[in-house]
Amino acid sequence: MNTKKSKSSFNVQDKGLDPPGQTLSCLPWQHEEYDRIRRQQASGKLSHALLVSGQAFLGKSHFAHAIVSAMLCESAESISNDGVLGRSACGDCTGCHLLAAGTHPDFRSLRPEDSKLIKIEQIRDVIAWVGQTAQRSGKKVVIVNPADQMNHQSANALLKCLEEPAGDSLIMLVTSHPGRLLPTIRSR
């Protein structure tokens, strides 16, 4: 088996990302919400935090990554002839290539460590990172998945960041169990 990849190929499954340009084709029930978020982004009215919740295995992670891909794509904000924002990332620009390679400087993904919890050190690191200037896209994006796996200290540290957002950033909390999040996080 040949494991060598061409420069233009995308092997993003290992990175936990969805291939740019193929973002929502398998989730037609998500298009309306996706379009609403993209319109908010285009008008400058997108909140600094989003809670993506729902039953397990309905595409929450895929949806979150579709938003990240479109936000960090350097050509996805073009408006089509009918006035609608581009639905998905192009897959060809530098931003898409960096995201596919898992090296985009304006994106971080927080997942539980070996203990199966997202620890306070991870949250503190991402809070410090969010406070720095974005390098490519003008916006820094963080996905916390599953957000309900934060321990109490992590959740409180994240709450401070949600109450006092730093810079132009978006924090997406993805969970199948929103009731496990602190009520103060859910209300932000």
Regions found by a protein language model. Name each.
Residues R188:
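Long, charge-dense, solvent-exposed interaction surfaces that engage phosphate-rich ligands
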Residues N2-Q153:
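Clamp-loader machinery-focused feature within the broader ASCE/P-loop NTPase space
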Residues L58, G179-R180:
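Short alpha-helical
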Residues G131, N156-S176, P183:
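Conserved catalytic/switch belt of AAA+ P-loop NTPases
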Residues F63-I67, D125-V126, A157, C161, ...:
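Alpha-helical scaffold elements adjacent to nucleotide-binding pockets in ATP/GTP-utilizing enzyme cores
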Residues N145-A147, L173-P178:
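A short beta-strand-to-loop transition that corresponds to the Sensor-1 phosphate-sensing loop
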